[in-house]
Amino acid sequence: MCDLVAYNVKDYGYAEYAENIEVSNGEFRRTRSLIPFNYLDASMQAFRWDLYGENVEVQRSIAESFIKRFCEYQKAGKGLYIYSRTKGSGKTLLACSLANGVMEYLDICVKFVSVPELLEMTKKSYKDFMEKEDLEKIRTAELLILDDIGAETKKEWIDTELFRLVDYRYSNKRVTIFTSNISMNALKLNERIVDRIFSMCIKLDLPEKSIRTIQAHDENMEFLKGVIK
């Protein structure tokens, strides 16, 4: 809800009208979650399951249960592993839609980070205390989206850092949503990491279809309708 308000500024008079925007708790939590701007308004209500052109009732049921029964997922320490080989198949969009849905009714700390970004933050944290603090918030978040796991280069220090993160979350039953172009069985990570991911996640395989391409086309056509007179 937005109301118009005017402010009387000393030695100036009344300023122009501005919108007094009431920010909901859910909106506030989203802005602090590090979810990319393009996905801040993503929701399950707007997620286009129909674009896949095939039966996705199982995937849809799992996704809906994650929001509706999140407390049970949390108690069991279970997250999701959202997988599809196809780029643009909606993995990140679905993960953010789920997180936004949970934040609408639960006061929990949610964080989003891609694995490449996480590794870059880790390197900087050796010299930067602020980066170290941010990493700790990511590590301990009640719900973490770890985007694009499996895309990282195979190096010992990377395995070490990922194990520390995954092991902490596994041991403390912190809910994690992983997204990946690589199936769990094919992850080229330390076996201890993969074992923990298997234990802490429900598999949610999306169809091999780029819905991003379809949505981009629809958005472009809608935009052109408004600018071509």
Please provide the spans of the model-predicted regions.
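A short, basic N-terminal segment
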Residues: 1-58, 65, 204, 208-229
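Short glycine-rich substrate-engagement loop in P-loop NTPases that contacts/grips substrate
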Residues: 54-61, 85-89, 99-140
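A short, well-structured juxtamembrane/interface segment
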Residues: 55-78
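Conserved alpha-helical scaffold flanking the Walker A/P-loop in AAA+ ATPase domains
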Residues: 65-71, 121-144, 160-168
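Walker A/P-loop nucleotide-binding motif
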Residues: 72-95
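Loop/turn-to-beta-strand initiation segments
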Residues: 108-109, 140-143, 172-178
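PRPP/pyrophosphate-binding module of the type I phosphoribosyltransferase fold
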Residues: 147
